[in-house]
Amino acid sequence: MDVIKPYKFIPKDRIERIATELRQKVESGRKRRLSAESIAETIADFLELNIMWEGIPADNIGKIAAMIFPTKQMIIINSNVSEFEKNGFRQSTIAHEIGHWILHINQQAVEKYIDRDDSIIEIVKQPQLFLCRSIQQSLAPKIEWQAQYFAGCLLMPEYKLIDAKRGRDLTQWKHLYPMAEDLGVTISNLKVRLKDLGWIIVNDSTRQIYPGRNMPK
């Protein structure tokens, strides 16, 4: 039984539902609100995924921000990537790897190896780009997109965005920046998510923001 699932198309609404249900499950078991500084780490802990920081050499595509070792239930974060000093980039990266764990890893197969002493089974020894979050996302395959979309839904579920929107004008960058900080994401993450939901329209040449057809009142 392979640890890595073969690629298959997953509708966006299904990815969003899976991510939202996971977020709600984590929140329901806590007395305190999730901190924007550690949302993804807390969810990883809930899933019993360990996080380790160490250097990861670049490959032929470019820098690798992180990778996941399924049979070790471990996310490796590249300690040499300076962008991790920014909380939003760190949260997005960890959430991305969680997306791979949920969407692309056969967890039943992982359980068969979990008690073994082997470091990593053969299928994981070979480089698997979709298990690594490359900084150069423009080169990412479809499974990378799925994991990143999952990450956006996990960190910015619609019900959290509705809360964060209160008292803010989403057509003003000066309101979006603190909103992104409150959510624990980058401004780019937030812009992409709001555009995808149809809440805003952004003129990329002028950076002017307009209300989208689905923007909540």
For each feature predicted by the language model, list its residue ranges:
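Active-site hotspot residues in diverse enzymes, especially metal/ion-binding acidic/histidine motifs
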Residues: M1-K217
